[in-house]
C-alpha cells in the first residue's frame, strides 16, 4: 500500500469587509469536498484559510462605523467563521492576515527579495485627497468620463461607455471619500521586479500546474512582457509597515497570499506533528494546492510563484481555478433577491442541498456555474431524496419488522455488487480531478440501478406472500448494503447525511476502503428520516428575505413616496415632438453576443434589423456575464445614431436598457410578435 500523501490546501481569503454570499461559497464548498475526499482516502490533508484583513477599504469602513479596524475585522471574522462552520466547511485553521505570523513572514519574504535585487524604487504621481490627507486609489476617485462625458464614473473606467483611462484623464475629479477636489502629488513607491521571473513563469505555467484555459490566458500577459508590480502604499493605511521604511506599507495583495503560510504556521504551533518547513522549503515533497476564482489568477499564478521563487521557497503544485456563480442565468442581483448571503440561505434551507447542487454542476474547467433555483429544487428532491435516501427508507422497515433489525448474510445481487465495486475507481478519479459533476453522475447512475433492482424485486409485494420472508430479508439486506456504498461515495459532499447514515447503519465513521466490504448478520439502529424534500415556498421565502437584506442595508423598510426612481434620477427637460421623432427606434434580433477581449464592461452585439446587420458595443456585461444567453432575444435599438469609432471597433447604434448600471441593467424587449426591423413608435 502506498504511503499517505502530505497535502496542504487553501481557498482564497475572503475580504474582511462584508458578508459571505453564495458566490463565495462555491469556492469553499468545492475545496472542502476535495479535502474531505483526500481525508476519506487516508491522506494527510490540511485545509487552511484566513480573512484578508488589510487595505484602505477596511480602514475607511471602520472609521465610518466609529470603531477601530481591529474591532471591525474581529467582528467580520466571527461572522465568517460561523457561516463557514454552518455550511460544513471544515478548515483545519481559519486565521487572519492581521497576525504576527503574517507580519514576520511578509517581512522575511520582502527582505529576501530586496537582498536578491528584486525590489526597485521610483517616484509615482497620484491623486491626493487634501481633506483626508491620503493618496487615493482609482476606485476612490470619481468624475466625468473623458470619452462620453458620463458623470459619476470611477477613476479607471466608465461603466456607461466601457472606456478605460488613467485617473489623471478624468474630468472634474472628486474624492469619493470626502468630496474634495484631489491634487497631484509625487511619492516614492516600491516595486517587485516581476520581469526577473519571466522565463521561470513561462515554464511553470505550462508545467501542468494550471488548467489549459488559464495557462493560455496567462500566456497573453507573458507574451506581451511583464511589468514591475507596485507593492507599496502610503500612510494612512491599515496593514504592515515595510521594514525600515516609515510611512510605507505593504500593498494588501503582497501580504494576502503570504496569509496562507501564516495560517499554516499558526496551526503548526498548536499541532506539533506538523513541520512548517517540510511544507514550504524549496525542496518540499509535500503537495500544495490553491483553489481560487478566475478573477484573481494573475496574483496567484504570476506574482505569487515569482515571490516564492525569489524568496527561495517552494511553489504551488497546482492552482485550481473556477468560474463565477450566476443565479437563474444572470449575475446575482440584489433587487431581484438573487444576491443571497450565506446566512440568509442557512436561515431557510439545509446546507447540504447546496453542497450537492454545486457538486453536481462543478467540472474541472473554469466555466461559470448557474444556480437555477427551479432546477435546484428538482435535482435535490429527485437525486438525494427520491433516489439515495429512498433506498434506505424502502428497505429498513422490512428488516426491523421481519428480522428484529438484523441484516442477513449473503449477496442477493452479485452483478450489482460487482458494478458498484467496479465504479469506485472512476468515481475516485473524478473526485481527484475535481470533476465533481462526473462523480455525481456516476453515483446517481448506481442509485438508479439499485432502485430499479429493488422495484423489480418488490419486497413490499413479497412480504404479503406466504413463505417469502427469507427472500424479502435478502433483498432488503442487499439494498442497505448498496445504500451504504452510495453514502461512502457521497460522504465528501454530504458529511451530515453520511453521519446520520452511519448512526442508522450502526457503524464507525466510514472510510473509502469500506466500500470493499459488506454488512452481514449486522444489527441496524431504528431508521429515522434522513433528508426532507425542498419546499419551493422556502426558496421563495429566501428570495424575499434577500430583498429585505437589501432594504435593511439601505436603511429603509419600504421605499416611501418621493424616494422612488424619479427621485434618484429626475426627468430631463421637456423636448419638442420633432426632436423625439428624429430618433429612429427599431426592433432588433440579437444574432450574436460575445465579450470584448480587454474590456471589463463591454459586450459586442450583432443585431439583425430586418434587411441588414449592425455591430453594437454595449456596456452591459456586468449584468449579463454569459452573453450567449442573449442570443435569439429581441431588443430595442437606436438605429440612426451616428457610428462611433471605439478602441475595439465601430459601434453602429445603441441598445435600450433600464437601470442604474453595474449589475442592475435590464435590457428592454418588445412583446412577442414584434419582428426585427419594425419601427418603435
Curated annotation (Swiss-Prot):
Its cofactor is: Zn(2+)
Q: What is the E.C. number?
A: 6.1.1.10
Show where the tRNA-binding domain sits.
579-681
- State the Gene3D superfamilies in the record: HUPs, Isoleucyl-tRNA Synthetase, Domain 1, Methionyl-tRNA synthetase, Zn-domain, Nucleic acid-binding proteins
Q: Name one GO molecular function term.
A: tRNA binding
Does Nuclease appear among the keywords?
A: no
Tell me which Gene Ontology terms the entry assigns under biological process.
methionyl-tRNA aminoacylation
- What InterPro entries does the record tag this protein with? aa-tRNA-synth_I_CS, Anticodon_Met, Met-tRNA-synth_bsu_C, Met-tRNA_ligase_1, Met-tRNA_synth, Methionyl/Leucyl_tRNA_Synth, MetRS_core, MetRS_Zn
- For this UniProt entry, what is the primary localization, expressed as one broad class? cytoplasm
Q: Which Pfam families match?
A: Anticodon_3, tRNA-synt_1g, tRNA_bind
- Fetch the CDD domains from UniProt: Anticodon_Ia_Met, MetRS_core, tRNA_bind_EcMetRS_like
Swiss-Prot/TrEMBL keywords: Aminoacyl-tRNA synthetase, ATP-binding, Cytoplasm, Ligase, Metal-binding, Nucleotide-binding, Protein biosynthesis, RNA-binding, tRNA-binding, Zinc
Enzyme class, broadest EC rank: ligase
Q: How is the cofactor bound?
A: Binds 1 zinc ion per subunit.
UniProt motif ('KMSKS' region) ranges: 331-335
Q: Which GO terms describe its cellular component?
A: cytosol
Q: Write out the residues that bind Zn(2+).
A: 145, 148, 158, 161
Q: Superkingdom, according to UniProt?
A: Bacteria
Name where it's found.
Cytoplasm
- Which reaction is recorded as catalysed by this protein? tRNA(Met) + L-methionine + ATP = L-methionyl-tRNA(Met) + AMP + diphosphate
Read off the NCBIfam families from this record.
metG (TIGR00398), metG_C_term (TIGR00399), PRK00133.1 (NF001100)
For this protein, the record's PANTHER family field holds:
METHIONINE--TRNA LIGASE, METHIONINE--TRNA LIGASE, CYTOPLASMIC
Family of this protein:
Belongs to the class-I aminoacyl-tRNA synthetase family. MetG type 1 subfamily.
- Quaternary context: Homodimer.
Role: Is required not only for elongation of protein synthesis but also for the initiation of all mRNA translation through initiator tRNA(fMet) aminoacylation.
Question: What protein name does the entry list?
Answer: Methionine--tRNA ligase
Species, as recorded: Pseudomonas putida (strain W619)
Q: Which gene encodes it?
A: metG
